Structures are given as structure tokens and as C-alpha cells.
């Protein structure tokens, strides 16, 4: 039971970091976590896997959710914090053969583009 409580608290702390300054989203995330603890979405999972799922959600919130706020000049200020995962985008630069248009794309003009 203490592991479940620890995972729940971990989720609440992660939501506080991810949704800092956005009270509406913070309250919605807290309500969703509370509901998921009382009525698990996958009740057939063993408790240890449900605890792992809650910890994974907390990790995802900390590392991958970034709040943005529109500024006066139609730009966005992102709330990037110390736990935000910043990738180097190297995987984006490499083209995957499965995603390349084999037949030349929808209009036929891309034949030989990704070779």
C-alpha cells in the first residue's frame, strides 16, 4: 500500500511541475489521478503493474509535457524546466525507408527523392 501511495504522490508532484501556473490543468490532472487510483482503468492488472503505470505517467509528465503561453506579439513562451527532456533531433534527420514515398508520393513527383 505504501508503494501505491508513493506512486500517487509522485504523480501529483509531476503534475505540479508540468502544469505550474495553469490551475485548471493542474486540478484536472489531480482529479484524473485520484479517479485512476480509486477506479483503475485496467483493474485486471496486478497492483505492482498499476504502480509502475502511475510512475511511468509521472515520468512522462515531468519529461515530455511543456506548457506554453501566448505572449503579446503572437509568440509562445514555453515553461521548460530542469526535468524537461531535450532531444538532439538526430533521429529526425535520418530518413526511414518505410516512411519514404516508394511510388513517388501522392502526386508522383517524389520518385527517387529518398534514395
UniProtKB/Swiss-Prot annotation:
GO terms for molecular function: protein folding chaperone. Residues 1-35 form a transit peptide. The keyword Membrane does not apply. InterPro entries: Complex1_LYR_LYRM7 (IPR045298), MZM1/LYRM7 (IPR050435). It is found in: Mitochondrion matrix. Interacts with RIP1. This is Mitochondrial zinc maintenance protein 1, mitochondrial. It comes from Kluyveromyces lactis (strain ATCC 8585 / CBS 2359 / DSM 70799 / NBRC 1267 / NRRL Y-1140 / WM37) (Yeast). Keywords: Chaperone, Mitochondrion, Transit peptide. Signal peptide: none annotated. One of its GO terms (cellular component) is mitochondrial matrix. Belongs to the complex I LYR family. MZM1 subfamily.
Amino acid at each position: 500500500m505504501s508503494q501505491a501511495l508513493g506512486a500517487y504522490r509522485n504523480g501529483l508532484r509531476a503534475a505540479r511541475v508540468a502544469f505550474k501556473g495553469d490551475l485548471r490543468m493542474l486540478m484536472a490532472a489531480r482529479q484524473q489521478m485520484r479517479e485512476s487510483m480509486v477506479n483503475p482503468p485496467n483493474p485486471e492488472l496486478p497492483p505492482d503493474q498499476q504502480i509502475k503505470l502511475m510512475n511511468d505517467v509521472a515520468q512522462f509528465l515531468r519529461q515530455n509535457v511543456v506548457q506554453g503561453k501566448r505572449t503579446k506579439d503572437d509568440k509562445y513562451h514555453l515553461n521548460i524546466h530542469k526535468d524537461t527532456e531535450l532531444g538532439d533531433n538526430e533521429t529526425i534527420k535520418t530518413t526511414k525507408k518505410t516512411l519514404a514515398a516508394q511510388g513517388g508520393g501522392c502526386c508522383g513527383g517524389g520518385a527517387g527523392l529518398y534514395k
